[in-house]
Structures are given as C-alpha cells and as structure tokens.
A protein has these predicted regions:
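Active-site substrate-recognition segment that forms the wall
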Residues: 112, 167-175, 293-425
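Helical element adjacent to the flavin cofactor pocket in flavoenzyme catalytic cores
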Residues: 198-202, 224-297
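Glycine-rich Rossmann-fold phosphate-binding loop(s) that bind the pyrophosphate
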Residues: 86-92, 112
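N-terminal glycine-rich dinucleotide-binding loop that anchors FAD/FMN and/or NAD(P) in oxidoreductases
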Residues: 124-145
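Rossmann-like flavin
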Residues: 138-250
C-alpha cells in the first residue's frame, strides 16, 4: 500500500517553477533518480495528515510506548529559549546537543502527530555511509576538496552513531557488518568504476572497501544473478524509532519539554518589545500552533518535507517526494543458514537504487527501501492505493515466487522525504 503522508493544504496546491537541480554526469545516488539533470519542479506542499496515515512497521512495534502521545506539561509553554519543530532523529538530536551545550536554556519540541511518526519512523533503517559513490556528483558541484569532506562527514557520523549505541547499550536492533553496492548492468558498473577510481586518485581512502569487478564472483558474493560488480564496506542497520526514543528520554530527563499532537502552523517575528524574562535579551520569534503560541529566541526547523507548509519562503526549495518502504518475510530459500548476511544498495540505470536491510539478530524480516525505477510513477499514484507492479516483480526476482512467496509479501506503507537542491533534507 502506498499512503501519502502529506495532507492537502487549505489553499490550492502551490505551483513552483524555475527551481532546478544541478546536473551531474555521475548518477549513482538516490536523490538524483527522481529527476536527472536540470528540470523545472512543479510541486505542492501540505501539513501532516491528522488521520488516515499509514502505520509503519517501526511504529507498529511501539504502540505501548508512553512517548507516543507525551506532553511534558499539560499546557503549552508560553515562552522558551528554543523551539524545535519536529521530533524525528534531527529534532531529537538537536535537543540533545542543545541541552549539553546550554543546560540552563529552555527547549520545547513540538510534534504535529505522535512522537517520531514522520520520516524517521518510516525509513528502512539502513545506516550506510557513502564511501565513494557520491564523489562524482559532489566534485562537480563543490570541487574535489569539499567532495572529500562530505564523504568523510558521512563516515564520521556513522562511527559516532555506532559508538553512541554501544556506549549507552541502546536497544535498537543494531547490526554492524558489510554493506554491498551492486551495479546490475554494464553501464552502471562502468560508471561506478569510473567514480571509484576518480575518488581513489583524488586521495580518497579505499583500503577498507573490497571491490570485485568480475561479474561471476560478484554474483556469488551478492547472490544476485545479474550483478556486474560489488563494492563492500562496513555499515549498519537498526530500528530508527527505538534509537530516537532512547535519546528523547535522555532529553526529557535533562529538562526538554516535548509536546506531541501540536502542529506548528506558522513562525512570525515577535512583535512585543517586552524582554525575555530574566534573560536580558528580546524574543525574536513566535511559533503558532493549534494549541497556542510560543515566544522564543531561536527556532530550529526539523520537520523535513513539511517545512514549506508553514514557511512559505522555502516552497520550491524543499519539495516533498513520496517514497515507499516494504517489509518482506523471507521464504525458505533466504531463511536460516541461507538468510541474507549483508545489507545492499542495488544500483540500477538512471540512478535508481534499492536499499535492502535484512534485520539480522532481530525478527529476520527484510526491509526494502531506496528509490526504485518506478519512482516517477509513485509520484502519480501517491494519493491512492496501488498494487506493487515493477516493485513486486523485482521482489520475485530476488526471493522467487510460488505460494510461499505470494503469501509472505507485506507492504508496510510509505512516507514523504524532503528534497532540496541535490541533497536530502534530514
């Protein structure tokens, strides 16, 4: 089932023209598969649905969690030093580091629906640092030096994530092992090799990446018969909602105020000249919600695809795109001793990519995400229930068919990711 998570706005859809994405000769990334090269974007915006949204696999597992509808105080605070809009991993981490650096400053997190029910609660749980694949695109946009820094930041972020989970013994189904990038046709394999070699020639670290260019060996390693090459390096999978909940509980203990089911509708300059009580500085903003308004000094926008709904200046710069993630229960051919032992990035033509996350050490199901070859079609059917089509056929190619295969397919819904000019907005 495909379920659009963006409600139709009160006003007619806003059409935005003249927004382009940077072109690139190295199309190996998810964000480029939704529109290659320069294009005019026509999009609409909207607030999160108040009802009728799908319940993702991650959210199904935490229905008894008291954070779901948590409100730290019965009434919405009238003022705060900082208001964070959105309680996904971005908003939750911002609150964490805010309290670590400024423990005396007040923080209020407002969430339109239940806690962590947006993109973080709907993704595939694949924590995969880009080690080389984005180099061609970033080099063209920002130059070689900055491209290297972007990729190093991905690695640093992943290492910090794993270290935090292990240090604090976070119950979030963490698995660490090799992830496989697998080009599935000769053209994509050639492009992947070119980008990889350019990255290495520029001084990129590749000692930890195991490259296999022989198609027969790649097919053996990956168990994908059409594989033309394989690139392997360490990555992770996890249950993202559980991780976010752990961090938010730490935040609450540190004094963060969480207000769920409190959609922000607009942010306006603060109009009163009254100084912030006891702070010696003026408020700068007012966050307007369905439950009242909060005066504050700073606002952090962590609402992903929904941001343009309440911040009109960003309409066209951040655009919502529907994405779909599926849960599959593996048949016997991919269960037990024959279960998939790696996560995957299956690279297809035109930048399409399947992200495959086998839940090692958890319930053993396999999560499929990414940006499939039918992504443009998904844009068209995002407002109605649709069958699997090409996605189902690809699943059959991997897992086989028969009664067991048909019985064990499970769709678990979709969500909306926010895309900026060539980069995903967290």
């Amino acid at each position: 089932m495909v379920s659009n998570q963006i409600a139709t706005p009160t006003d007619p859809a806003v059409l935005v023209t003249g927004v382009t994405k940077p072109d690139s000769s190295a199309i190996l990334n998810v964000d480029e598969s939704v529109g290659n090269g320069k294009e005019t974007v026509t999009t609409e915006w909207g607030f999160p649905r108040s009802k009728g949204q799908s319940l993702s696999y991650w959210l199904q597992q935490v229905r008894d969690d008291e954070l779901l509808d948590h409100r730290t105080t019965e009434e919405l605070p009238e003022a705060a030093d900082t208001v964070i809009i959105g309680s996904g991993i971005t908003g939750t981490l911002v609150a964490k580091y805010h309290k670590q650096n400024w423990p005396d400053k007040s923080v209020v997190v407002v969430e339109a629906r239940d806690f962590c029910s947006g993109a973080t609660g709907r993704n595939a749980g694949h924590c995969k640092p880009d080690q080389w694949r984005g180099f061609g695109k970033y080099e063209k946009q920002f130059g070689s030096e900055q491209a290297m820094k972007i990729l190093q930041n991905e690695q640093d972020t992943w290492e910090a994530l794993v270290a935090y989970i292990r240090e604090h013994n976070v119950d979030c189904d963490l698995w660490v092992g090799d992830t496989l990038d697998v080009p599935m046709d000769a053209e994509t394999a050639s492009l992947a090799k070119d980008v990889f070699e350019r990255y290495r020639a520029a001084g990129g670290k590749v000692d930890h990446i195991k490259m296999t260019s022989d198609p027969e060996e790649a097919a053996r390693i990956t168990r994908l018969q059409e594989a033309k090459a394989c690139y392997a390096w360490p990555a992770s999978t996890l249950q993202p909602r559980k991780l976010t909940a752990h961090i938010m509980r730490v935040n609450l203990a540190a004094g963060v105020n969480l207000q769920t089911f409190t959609p922000a509708r607009s942010v306006t300059p603060y109009e009163d000249d009254t100084k912030a009580e006891g702070k010696g500085e003026r408020y700068r903003w007012t966050v307007h919600t369905d439950r009242g308004s909060i005066a504050c000094t700073d606002v952090v926008h962590a609402s992903n695809a929904y941001l343009p709904a309440y911040e009109p200046s960003l309409r066209g710069l951040i655009r919502p795109k529907p994405h779909m993630c599926n849960k599959v229960i593996p048949p016997l051919a991919f269960a037990g001793s024959r279960a998939l032992r790696h996560s995957y990035g299956v690279l297809l033509r035109d930048g399409s990519l399947f992200s495959i996350n086998p839940r090692h050490g958890a319930d053993g199901v396999v999560m499929f995400g990414g940006s499939n070859p039918g992504q443009r079609k998904l844009d068209e059917v995002g407002r109605r229930t649709a069958g699997g089509g090409p996605a189902v056929r690809r699943r059959r190619a991997l897992f086989g068919e028969g009664k067991e295969g048909r019985r064990r397919r499970r769709w678990y819904g979709g969500g909306a990711a926010g895309y900026g000019r060539g980069a995903e907005v967290c």
